[in-house]
Amino acid sequence: MTLYKIGEIVYKNNNNIILESKGEGNLVTICDNSRYSKGEKLKLYLYEVKNDYIQQTYGFKTFKERLLFTDLISIDKIGPKTAMLILDQNWELVANLIAEGDWKEISKINYISDKSAKLICVELKDKWAKIIQNKEVKKFDDITNIKELKQTLNKLGFKASDIDYAVNNISSTKELDLMVEESINLITTQMHANNQTT
């Protein structure tokens, strides 16, 4: 089983990318696709679904995102496509909703019934509360701000890799306008530093 591959995205079309790694082109289905850009070099965690009806490889930015995917597809009536739709909402947001047992918010996701949302929380709440217990469970508003920040920076024309850098290094998640301002400063500082080393 291949856990991850390191390569470059040479093609992107919505939620499908081709990851070139060691001279091979790998067709991979992703979620939350604004995080990815053509030409980006990255480590992509993989999960392959192979049976009589389908052979498809799914890709994830982090191991925890992949772990959440495998946990979701272990739930009755949740297949890979539905799990990817759930993760499309931002996997960290979903993980925190599960840890908080907020099935009502999860049920607002397309194709997720109240019954499925409740089952997800019952089956996975304790596990994901433990996984993220080293951090304080983020409030819903904070997660929403991060999502809005990503959308704003994307509209401003920043690349997915720059947006991820800003989100991972930002110091506050309270006020969106301050987050945007700090993110732009972080990205421009990083770009300037990269230019000096090249």
Swiss-Prot record:
InterPro entries: RuvA, RuvA_2-like. Residues 144-198 are annotated as: Domain III. Residues 140-144 are annotated as: Flexible linker. Residues 1-61 are annotated as: Domain I. It is found in: Cytoplasm. It comes from the Bacteria. The keyword DNA-binding applies. Its main location: cytoplasm. GO terms for molecular function: DNA helicase activity; four-way junction DNA binding. It holds the Pfam family HHH_5. The RuvA-RuvB-RuvC complex processes Holliday junction (HJ) DNA during genetic recombination and DNA repair, while the RuvA-RuvB complex plays an important role in the rescue of blocked DNA replication forks via replication fork reversal (RFR). RuvA specifically binds to HJ cruciform DNA, conferring on it an open structure. The RuvB hexamer acts as an ATP-dependent pump, pulling dsDNA into and through the RuvAB complex. HJ branch migration allows RuvC to scan DNA until it finds its consensus sequence, where it cleaves and resolves the cruciform DNA. Belongs to the RuvA family. Has three domains with a flexible linker between the domains II and III and assumes an 'L' shape. Domain III is highly mobile and contacts RuvB. This is Holliday junction branch migration complex subunit RuvA. It comes from Mycoplasmopsis synoviae (strain 53).
